[in-house]
Amino acid sequence: MRIGQARYRFEFRLLAGESADDFGTVAALRPLIAPWTADVADSELTLLRVTEYTFRAQIADRWRRGNIFILGDAAHLTPPFIGQGMGAGVRDAMNLAWKIAGVRNGTLAADVLDSYEQERKPHTRSMIWLALNVGRSMTGGGRIGNLVRRLVLPRVRLLPGLRDMVVDSTTPALRSSALVSKSRRPRQLAGTLCPNPPLPGGQRLDDAVGAGFAFITTSPPGDADEALLRRRGVAVLVANGDTELKKWLREGRCAAAIVRPDRTVMRAGRDSTALCAWTATVLRPAAAPQSPAP
């Protein structure tokens, strides 16, 4: 793997009886890296680091006890084959932080904190499963496996489903929870990530909305609906014209969507007034701070 202009990272499986200490010099590494460095003299190679990793795939049984939550590597360990280990920890933090803030400022009920594990655990399990299978496809099978990899991997990008999961790093949708309301339709926006396209004013959606909720609609809401949303700190964005947001709503077969601070779609539908009314049952106007239930 190329890192920057002049650094490369190589990974090799250690055989029985071998350790990283056996490969502490360029000379010792030569047989392994020769296919990529045959024309490079030893004097032009600088060995920066040799280290040994043990890859694990683990998920904690419980992610919450009272007001104590675990996240990141404390909650799950992901093999590195799809580069999603750190990303999973960031998703944990993004999923949990705004919920705690909402409970503290009174806009969310304390029991929504249970949705952290309900949403993140199945998602993490899916990503670990994918990483394990990608790892097996990259390293298993001996000589036959090597032959299959040479034939198949260059063509992965031609298969839409695999390309989205492996090459484009498309993340699975979250399951239903107190803060993800899905319909029975097989393809829908609820639980998926909202895009971050440029808006007509030049800003991107994330910059315009900040760390709050967003109500994205193809037509402006009525005065009463807009006032209801504003009282709950929800930004209103109208996706009109030939914009990426309007195309996104159209592909999701809906006219409006309510998007969470972590940019997950909470709910979407064709009736924006009904969606506003539903939002009012989940989000409350700011009130006195409260503590999560023990």
Question: Which ranges hold each PLM region?
Answer:
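Short gly/ser/thr-rich secondary-structure transition/capping motifs
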Residues: V50-R56, P195-P200
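Helical substrate-recognition/capping region of FAD-dependent monooxygenase/halogenase enzymes
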Residues: P35, V103-P294
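Hydrophobic alpha-helical bundles that form the membrane domains of multi-pass transporters
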Residues: I68-D73, A88-N95
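Conserved FAD/dinucleotide-binding core of flavoprotein oxidoreductases
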Residues: M1-V50
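Glycine-rich phosphate/pyrophosphate-binding beta-alpha loops
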Residues: H76-G87, S137-G140
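Catalytic cores of eukaryotic secretory-pathway lumenal/extracellular enzymes that build
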Residues: F81-G83, G87, M94, L113, ...
